[in-house]
């Protein structure tokens, strides 16, 4: 069901300046969603630049200076960078309004399929920054919720333009729903894989949306031990995995090793890409490969 988000709750009217006001976000996918709804009303900048890990990134002194000029900060809420830096960013720019884009998202605990429920009850699972699997944007369901959170935030800080934000929000929702429809169509094919391996488990929400099995290579955020590698090779064969995803900010040597032992393909993806729709489609497309003759690798 589509949630209706009201712009009329809270917020204050912005006085327009000659210079375009700035909104800062943590990562590039969030910049994509924010720009899609904000249009030309704001300049949107990302704290974590392309090619950097949002788990370990440290902002430059210039970024901290620039942040003081921002109107608002949109955060995912559970990324390592945010866990480490939010308090410091607040101290650096006490006027800055923070908005959590994970609000109303049903969260997953790390590499498990346990859920963090709204009543605060958390099932036992792995620990990550904040104890939560943070890659909420890699999901068409969550993307619609994030879009609603962005809409509410923009209306709170700039009520005068709420109608324009609502129009762009509706257009973005249509694009997200179209992307979801195409992915559902692809993954409903009998040739579509139901399991995949990935170095860093960034596709937990993608896997949940489409009932897939994600098998992470790293163990607790660390390189796999020789024993764990052997278990992964066995899992790869047992689950009939044909694709191993690797990301640019992580070492791919273990993925290549498993691929050599199992005949699987290594496919590069970038879940942190600004081009969210294209990245989601590419990920789904990689799971839709013609079957090889029996006994042969890819």
Model-identified regions with their sequence ranges:
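Sec-dependent bacterial lipoprotein signal peptides
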Residues: 1-5
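Extracytoplasmic metal-acquisition and chelation regions
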Residues: 7-298
